[in-house]
Amino acid sequence: MDLIRNTIEGLLYDFPIELMGNYITKDDSIDINEILIDIIKRKDVSFTQTDISLLSEVINDTWCTDAEFGISPETSSLTNRILLLMTEFSKHVLNLAGLHNPTVRFNELLRWRTLSLKVGEDILVLPLLARYDTLCRIKRKRFLWPMVLEHDNLRLNAILDEELSDTHSHINAATDVFEFNWLRLMNMPGRKKDKGTFWISSAKKDYDLISRASNNHYPLPCWAVIAATVRAMLWASVTENEDACPITRVMVEEMLESEDSIYNKLESLNPLIATFLENALETSNGIKIDYAIDARDFISDVPSSPYLVHHGERNFLYQWFKSFFDNEHGARENADLMLLYLIIKCKVRREFVQTNNLRGFVNFQDYDHEKVSTLDTEEEKWEKAFREITYRYAVQTSCGDKKRFNLEARVTPNNIRSVRKMNYRQAIFGDSDFLQRNDNPSITLIAHFIKGVDKQKNEFTCRHADLRKTLKKQMNQIINRIGEYSMGNGPHLIGLDAAGSELGCPPEVFAPFFRYAKLHGLTNFTYHVGE
């Protein structure tokens, strides 16, 4: 089991994108199997040379065959079969039963978590679901489970279903930053911010020796556009809209050969996505976040679950893999394009989700800085609506629909008013309520002040003069609105927090401001140390 887990990680997480692109453009000198084995040898020294020498044969003849569907080395190349690695792994780890949501076998939970942390859960779940449903001759329409699957330990689940409190939740970190940004990249390709994000320099890949050794001749924005193109092309195929789709495999190959061609193809891609979005389900505040969330699938009722946000990507993967097992819509012939799509997705994901091996607060901050939108929509109304969706998602997925869980969310002082004004009771899609009417999630707020190193070396000013001025301004804003923040239907402000490393910013900087707040009725204070 560990060997197949390492193989999948090597394929999706470590495999150089440009080599996969070169393979698709008919570079016969590239051996996917050979490269994959070389990656595993370099990453995991726990396997012997004998283990590794047998791996190539096992991949080709055992893991990447499926007799039930006539998929074997005699019928297709390894590249068109290698996605079977996911079903081979997941069938030993997941429980499937009819149309119920999948669960993880408790005794396999560590192996599942170790791999899904690197590549995400949906990539491992949807292929197995598609295979299972094809064999059972059923087709599911809704994919509304949490981003982290539940396990099958009923006694432990019963304990976890009791009332719980999260007293240190960073609300930005609870928004599934990567998932939301990926939806925007796939539905608004080519539109990006020019600074402050991984688009300028994918720095986190430099921590990884395999990534550093690979010649990534395109920056990540280009690969994201290619992924959006592949997704639109495959979506048109599985939904039988190929006649209206101007994107062809030849066009994708041209994009892989020339960077200029990538953005030229946006002239065909953006109108196609706009056509797909005509049938997309709108959120309650009137935006369409994913063309694969088809409104025609929810004519009778729109689920109030916040996980409907993920339905589109899951629906796309499910329909494509179902076509793969049914041998329809040219899915098997385009399996290498799906593999390219998944590799690009994992490369972008590793820029948002902390999966590298570094430790310490600086590494944490590198990822924390990515908890923002990567795209510039140029539309303030759209941006505001999207922000409300992400915050509503964070609160609803944390608190649950039965108010069993209590959330103490940390927000910056400047965001308190906007966070309090948001309607967390209303469902993200449709007109229904996520909670019962006149009910609100159990959420309270902590004002989150950020420590800073003293940058002004001047004998005529006190230490941290600029930070003290900022703290004074922010604290006065809070004190002047303390009555507003402590009443009404929105989340109440109940305390203050000084976050970040105390190195270079001792408690003396915050002490007078905390005393000032205490005089005005705030008595709940926390101060981060040891980071």
Where does each model-flagged region fall?
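Metal-cofactor-binding active-site regions of metalloenzymes
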Residues: 1-531
